Amino acid sequence: MSERRRSAVALSSRAHAFSVEALIGSNKKRKLRDWEEKGLDLSMEALSPAGPLGDTEDAAAHGLEPHPDSEQSTGSDSEVLTERTSCSFSTHTDLASGAAGPVPAAMSSMEEIQVELQCADLWKRFHDIGTEMIITKAGRRMFPAMRVKITGLDPHQQYYIAMDIVPVDNKRYRYVYHSSKWMVAGNADSPVPPRVYIHPDSLASGDTWMRQVVSFDKLKLTNNELDDQGHIILHSMHKYQPRVHVIRKDFSSDLSPTKPVPVGDGVKTFNFPETVFTTVTAYQNQQITRLKIDRNPFAKGFRDSGRNRTGLEAIMETYAFWRPPVRTLTFEDFTTMQKQQGGSTGTSPTTSSTGTPSPSASSHLLSPSCSPPTFHLAPNTFNVGCRESQLCNLNLSDYPPCARSNMAALQSYPGLSDSGYNRLQSGTTSATQPSETFMPQRTPSLISGIPTPPSLPGNSKMEAYGGQLGSFPTSQFQYVMQAGNAASSSSSPHMFGGSHMQQSSYNAFSLHNPYNLYGYNFPTSPRLAASPEKLSASQSTLLCSSPSNGAFGERQYLPSGMEHSMHMISPSPNNQQATNTCDGRQYGAVPGSSSQMSVHMV
């Protein structure tokens, strides 16, 4: 009964309070309505993420301003206000506690981050074939390299950008060549130590990252599990997936190159299916090799190497000349021709005061700016076929004026006159006129010959060049092409042998490539010392018999008064005649009816 009375009293007092307020009017009722509206405003501010807790507390304190007035009212009124305010503020406290930290704002900012793969078309082409990446012990860079564009970062927040590479599966693969496919070969090898490549520009603001393309072109792959250079360690013949990580600064405490990437709300990871690759130590698919050479700017050496090699093979096939494995004459070997031409008192522009010809005085005749036209040998010259007949038959008139003037400067050379060529051309019978003329490729200034007796008869073929060909000292090391006829007589009276009146072989001697006639200046070799019997046998003649069996022999000629020897390589018989002055050193038989060898003097 007492409880009922208390509740009734309470009800009656509360009802009385409300009835009194209703009867009195509207003053306190208006204040209560205003307080409820303010409490609703506080709840709306608590729902806003930008609303700080301090402002809401001020507003709540501001909303408690009606309480002094309510305290002046009866106890029932204060009880009602306490009940209502406790409900309102409990709701506000819950909302404020949920929005107290920056986590919801950060979460929303991380969700907005997007990463776009650059060079996606190139990655797609490699992926369609089956991307392969070379790994080495020292480390090898990736191609294509991972390049990404990042958007959606907070411009004022600090971020790390990192990359790691994880296995796609737990399988090991092998390449099947006949089907050009990768097949599973077994289970994967044991896991390797984790490695994370942190971009060198980290730590940077979001604005900095968004203004640039983030490139991982310096990242290297290695198969050395003991690597200490920070390279990514991978197993060969496994498939891997690169991943890009965006890590906010406040979540980067556990970030390390030798630890896995931390996981949390401040880390977002991106991967692209087209970047999956298989690690190899050597490319398995030739299509991948060609595509990388074509698209990789660092593979320029491979492209140029192949092209140069092809060009060199084409040149060698076109000219098909043997080149001696020694250094050719350079322009520096002939230095003072122009100076001595104006100031010398000798019989020729290149003759010193003692009358000795100076081969080093023809420097100005070797100017590379003045070059005769390119040509090939005539079909019957040196028994070498002319591949392009329209380039043959070049005479003196075909040379540019600068070449002809240089040739004219050599007219005072006394050495290889027209009589000397007749000695090489024919011995006993009248020689037929050679059909073609061979001139050096650069300039005729380096035409030199072998000393011959001045009493030999003349030859009309070389009259156009006879006065222009000079003789250098016999210490000059010279190469001369010789064409011998297998059907010719072995008793030819000159040192080259063969029936040259039929082959028309000796027209001129060139010392410049690519035409196989060279000049050198070397000291006398001690190996070629003259024996007494050779000295006595070679005092009177320069003649060596040349049989027709096509074998090559090295021959010595030791003229009187000379401290040098001459070697010539020409056809030699199996049994040397006792009368010739050449020692035959066989170099082997040469097929065919012609030989292309050289005479050189040291």
From Swiss-Prot:
Coarse class of the protein's main subcellular location: nucleus
Q: Does the keyword Membrane apply?
A: no
At the top level, the lineage of the source is: Eukaryota
Q: Where is the composition biased (Polar residues)?
A: 71-84, 425-446
SMART domains in the record: TBOX
Output the Gene Ontology terms for molecular function.
DNA-binding transcription factor activity, RNA polymerase II-specific; DNA-binding transcription repressor activity, RNA polymerase II-specific; protein homodimerization activity; RNA polymerase II cis-regulatory region sequence-specific DNA binding; sequence-specific double-stranded DNA binding
A biological process (GO) of this protein is:
embryonic cranial skeleton morphogenesis
- Per UniProt, which keywords does this protein have? DNA-binding, Nucleus, Phosphoprotein, Transcription, Transcription regulation
Residue numbers of Phosphothreonine PTMs: T330
| InterPro entries, per the entry | p53-like_TF_DNA-bd_sf (IPR008967), T-box_DNA-bd (IPR046360), T-box_sf (IPR036960), TF_T-box (IPR001699), TF_T-box_CS (IPR018186)
Extract the ranges annotated as region (Disordered): 46-84, 338-369, 425-447
Here the segments flagged for biased composition (Low complexity) are: 346-369
Q: Which residues bind DNA?
A: 122-304
The protein's location, in the record's own words, is:
Nucleus
Please provide one cellular component term from the Gene Ontology annotations of this protein: chromatin
Kindly give the Pfam families that the UniProt entry links to this protein: T-box
SUPFAM superfamilies named among the record's database cross-references: p53-like transcription factors (SSF49417)
Task performed by this protein: Probable transcriptional regulator involved in the development of the skeleton of the limb, vertebral column and head. Acts by controlling the number of mesenchymal precursor cells and chondrocytes.
Describe its partners and assembly state: Can form a heterodimer with TBX18.
Q: Which disease is it linked to?
A: Cousin syndrome: Defined as pelviscapular dysplasia with epiphyseal abnormalities, congenital dwarfism and facial dysmorphy (frontal bossing, hypertelorism, narrow palpebral fissures, deep set globes, strabismus, low-set posteriory rotated and unusually formed external ears, dysplasia of conchae, small chin, short neck with redundant skin folds, and a low hairline). Intelligence may vary from normal to moderately impaired.
| Name by which UniProt lists this protein | T-box transcription factor TBX15
Naturally occurring in which organism (per UniProt): Homo sapiens
Give the gene name.
Answer: TBX15
